[in-house]
């Protein structure tokens, strides 16, 4: 089940039950014959998944990574190193099209996913940039990007490096975590709260820390 507040400027909402055609640890089964591939894993996992993907690439595939975090650069590098010459379009985005939280009830994780916000515009690029027209055109066929497509639309970045630097998370999360570490530790040690109820945004940030972020 997917629903939630879905905050966005234009009031775009989409809720309902989601049925997955396939769930597998065998990537070959998942990507075989696919035209559009979405990679949405943490940056620390990029190398493992991309190395697994390279031998499975097929001509005509279009790969979108949310959030890119230089995954497109890494994928092209791995293709060269592994001798892959498939004709694919590789690109990524500066952030995710929406932010979600899995609902937890009485200590149990449920199958209910709440969307907290939806993006109305995202910055994207591909490598090489000569593929940018086809890459941007493929966005129309990604339902996860509908709030962007029907919002202010996707923005074309200058290069893949531009997309990497356009991600604000490193600028926000790292200083907020380091400067708010006392709040993080005291959240459970002093105040007795459940560790997983801590929120960097709600409990770690304060006006003085936010002021320091402006100067970074």
Give a label for each model feature.
Residues 24, 91, 151:
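General small-molecule cofactor/ligand-binding pocket signal
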Residues 27-28, 46, 132:
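Residues at or immediately preceding the N-termini of alpha-helices
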Residues 214-216:
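Conserved small/polar residues in nucleotide/adenosyl-binding loops
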Residues 43-109:
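Rossmann-like NAD(P)(H) cofactor-binding subdomain of soluble oxidoreductases
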Residues 77, 97-211:
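Substrate/ligand-engaging "lid" and interaction regions
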Residues 1-33:
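Conserved N-terminal Rossmann-fold NAD(P) cofactor-binding segment
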């Amino acid at each position: 089940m997917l629903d939630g507040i879905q905050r966005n400027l234009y009031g775009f909402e989409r809720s309902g039950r989601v049925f997955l055609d396939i769930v597998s640890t065998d990537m070959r089964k998942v990507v075989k014959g696919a035209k559009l591939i979405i990679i949405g894993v943490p940056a620390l996992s990029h190398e493992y998944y991309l190395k697994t993907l390279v031998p499975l690439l097929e001509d005509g595939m279009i790969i979108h990574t949310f959030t890119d975090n230089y995954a497109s650069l890494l994928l092209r590098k791995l293709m060269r190193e592994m001798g892959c010459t498939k004709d694919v379009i590789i690109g990524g985005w500066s952030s995710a099209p929406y932010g979600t939280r899995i609902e937890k009830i009485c200590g149990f994780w449920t199958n209910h996913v709440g969307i907290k916000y939806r993006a109305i515009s995202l910055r994207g690029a591909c490598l090489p940039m000569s593929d940018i027209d086809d890459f941007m055109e493929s966005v129309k066929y990604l339902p996860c990007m509908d709030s962007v497509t029907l919002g202010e639309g996707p923005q074309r970045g200058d290069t893949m490096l531009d997309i990497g630097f356009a991600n604000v998370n490193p600028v926000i999360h790292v200083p907020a975590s380091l400067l708010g570490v006392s709040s993080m530790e005291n959240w459970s040690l002093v105040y007795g709260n459940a560790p997983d109820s801590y929120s960097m945004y709600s409990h770690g940030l304060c006006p003085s820390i936010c002021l320091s972020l402006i100067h970074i």
